[in-house]
UniProtKB/Swiss-Prot annotation:
GO cellular component assignments: cytoplasm
Family matches, as SUPFAM superfamilies: Rhodanese/Cell cycle control phosphatase
EC number, UniProt record: 2.8.1.1
Protein name as annotated: Thiosulfate sulfurtransferase GlpE
Record keywords, A-Z: Cytoplasm, Transferase
Underlying gene: glpE
Natural source organism: Vibrio atlanticus (strain LGP32) (Vibrio splendidus (strain Mel32))
Compartment(s): Cytoplasm
Stated role: Transferase that catalyzes the transfer of sulfur from thiosulfate to thiophilic acceptors such as cyanide or dithiols. May function in a CysM-independent thiosulfate assimilation pathway by catalyzing the conversion of thiosulfate to sulfite, which can then be used for L-cysteine biosynthesis.
CDD domains listed in its UniProt record: GlpE_ST
Any single GO BP term: glycerol metabolic process
Length: 106
């Protein structure tokens, strides 16, 4: 895969519920602490190495940010690191929240 793909929040949730994909949230620590998707891994510069050590490169990765813009750059970065199936979640956390998908509030 040379390029990431786009996926909507419902499609992302379906992959998560099937235990097929790993969701990463790239928002800032304060926003993540206030609320984040139930299964989200907080991916930062500091957690990148541990994430790459524990995840299979063949496993689909869903990248979520605030509104689906920043996630595109992060998704492409993960593709460049060798992840085979990477998606940018369109609409980001905001769309996930509006769709009333499972959220943990801090």
């Amino acid at each position: 895969m040379d390029q990431f793909k786009h996926i909507d929040v419902k499609g992302a949730q379906a992959l998560i519920e099937q235990n097929e994909a790993r969701l990463v949230d790239i928002r800032d620590p304060q926003s993540f602490a206030v609320a984040h998707s139930e299964t989200a891994y907080h991916l930062t510069n500091d957690t990148m190495v541990s994430f790459m050590d524990e995840v299979e490169f063949e496993q689909p990765i869903l990248v979520m940010c605030y509104h689906g813009i920043s996630s595109q750059g992060a998704a492409q970065y993960l593709v460049n690191q060798g992840f085979e199936e990477v998606y940018s979640v369109d609409g980001g956390f905001e769309a996930s929240y509006r769709a009333e998908l499972p959220v943990i509030a801090g």
